[in-house]
UniProtKB/Swiss-Prot annotation:
GO biological process: rRNA processing; tRNA 5'-leader removal; tRNA processing
Record's GO cellular component terms: cytoplasm; multimeric ribonuclease P complex; nucleolar ribonuclease P complex; nucleus; ribonuclease MRP complex
GO MF term set: ribonuclease P activity; ribonuclease P RNA binding
Chain residue ranges for the region called Disordered: 1-36
Localization per record: Nucleus, Nucleolus; Cytoplasm; Cytoplasmic granule
Protein name as it appears in the record: Ribonuclease P protein subunit p20
Gene: Rpp20
Keywords linked to the UniProt accession: Cytoplasm, Nucleus, tRNA processing
PANTHER family tied to this protein: RIBONUCLEASE P PROTEIN SUBUNIT P20
């Protein structure tokens, strides 16, 4: 009996009502709508190749982007964390990161198998992670060129003695 797949003792069997409802409907999960379609926002999925997603992030950073945002949900949260940590590790201290968590509401369509019923919708929550990767080496400090009036005021301010009246 060691290798058998019997349910554990004490588990409650599912009700027949729940089973019937699920057997008569097909669940179609709708993808979440991206909030922002910007080049610096990268949506991490489990279907895309890991190396391709990492390469895309590296290309954005190497092209001069000050910051990029990685968005991931559910199963792809660990993948997003791995990409962020690899980017920071490979940058030799040039990159830093900040992480925020959130909950995203998703909508599923329940399509009936028979034509007598209507399509129904079901809302559910999913955990999401938003990772901001900052490029520390690209913070440009712009030094403005002084205008003529500023240079004259500075030259007068450098004279420390008493002003003499000229005749």
């Amino acid at each position: 009996m060691m290798g058998s797949n019997y349910p554990e003792h004490g588990t409650k069997p599912r009700s027949a009502k729940y089973h019937k409802q699920q057997n008569h409907r097909v669940v179609r999960k709708q993808p979440p709508r991206p909030a922002v379609s910007d080049r610096h926002n990268i949506y991490i999925t489990s279907k895309t190749d890991f190396k391709a997603q990492q390469r895309r992030c590296e290309e954005l950073i190497n092209s001069g982007a000050h910051e990029i945002f990685l968005h991931c949900m559910g199963f792809s949260v660990t993948r997003g964390l791995n990409i962020a940590l690899r980017l920071v590790q490979n940058s030799d201290g040039a990159l830093s990161y900040a992480i925020n968590t959130s909950t995203v509401q998703l909508v599923d369509e329940l399509h009936p198998l028979c034509d007598a019923e209507d399509i129904t919708f079901r809302q559910r929550n999913n955990s999401a992670l938003h990772i901001k990767i900052l490029n520390n080496s690209l913070f440009d400090i712009a030094v403005p060129q002084p205008s003529q009036s500023q240079t004259q005021a500075q030259s007068l301010g450098q004279f420390r003695g008493k002003a003499k009246a000229r005749q």
